[in-house]
Amino acid sequence: MKNRGTILVDKAIYTNKETIIQRKNKIKKNPDIPYAPPKSKSIKKKHDYNYAISLWLYIDARPPNTSYAYEKFTPLFSYRKMPEMLYKGTTNEFKIMMQKDLMNEQMHTIYKKKDLPLQKWNHFVINYDSGTLDIFLNNELVVSEKNVSPKIENEDIQIGSK
């Protein structure tokens, strides 16, 4: 079986600064399958995507005065905010938010975790299959959202924050 995956980043990226990954058409919709999730009233385009994004995050324990970014929820990873992974260092809180509707930019918290393991590699997998978004943390399914339709065009991936 041929591996159809694409490596977007092959080295460590620090999250104390914003890094934008230019992906330029690396994820494409399947033109042969018209699809719009059921119950979706505001989606004008039809989308059918099947993809997975795997990433490893290592968060060091730092004192609260390390950076202003530690005092607020700071993006660790964002794929056009569909989803966006945020971390608040002062309270060791982690959350995943996303825009559930293409026509409404309101963000919804779909997962929250207190006490994310520090000084340990945490493995995240974002799996999208024709309207269902599954997110795994360290091999455990933590989110499964149905009827989600991300708009994927030439979107960039953001890692870290200023």
Each language-model region and where it sits:
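Extracellular glycan-associated modules
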Residues: 1-162
